[in-house]
From Swiss-Prot:
Membrane topology qualifier: Peripheral membrane protein
Any single Gene Ontology cellular-component annotation: plasma membrane
Highest rank taxon of the organism: Bacteria
Listed name of the protein: Glutathione-regulated potassium-efflux system ancillary protein KefG
PANTHER family (alphabetical): GLUTATHIONE-REGULATED POTASSIUM-EFFLUX SYSTEM ANCILLARY PROTEIN KEFG (PTHR47307:SF1)
Family: Belongs to the NAD(P)H dehydrogenase (quinone) family. KefG subfamily.
Enzyme Commission code: 1.6.5.2
SUPFAM superfamilies in UniProt: Flavoproteins (SSF52218)
Function text: Regulatory subunit of a potassium efflux system that confers protection against electrophiles. Required for full activity of KefB.
Amino acid sequence: MSQTAKVLLLYAHPESQDSVANRVLLKPAQQLSNVTVHDLYAHYPDFFIDIPREQELLRQHDVIVFQHPLYTYSCPALLKEWLDRVLSRGFSSGPGGNQLAGKYWRSVITTGEPESAYRHDSLNRYPMSDILRPFELTAAMCRMHWMSPMIVYWARRQQPQALASHAKAYGEWLASPIPTGGH
């Protein structure tokens, strides 16, 4: 891709005002001209999703980033509703459902536990790669390229310098999200 990829950052946090980590991560994204930050809870507080509008946003972008906290081994309720309604059969899957084919999917996740909690012998009993498998499968169903997720573990307990480092790396990636040679 010779021009800068257009990124749609779907942000889903029901208590965004209380999430220091997510606010810090969003700052570089909000300063980049190739990134559209779309706060789902701000747009749809009543959960009535404008499906045609959302599908058009997806069509207009090359890379779709799903930024959210890990809630009960998944995503917040509004994002789950969004996934179920917007990524509909005939649009992104099934016969004729090729609107997202070839686009890129990246999950950017914040957690309340340390990385060590995501092991077979630890608190959550499964590694993050297993927990995120439904998202990876959804990307495959949509014929999208799954990109390695960015995970900020123990987000609430991150020191400001560590959060700033994550935000800097995230911003640099958002500025040029598609690796040379495709995926």
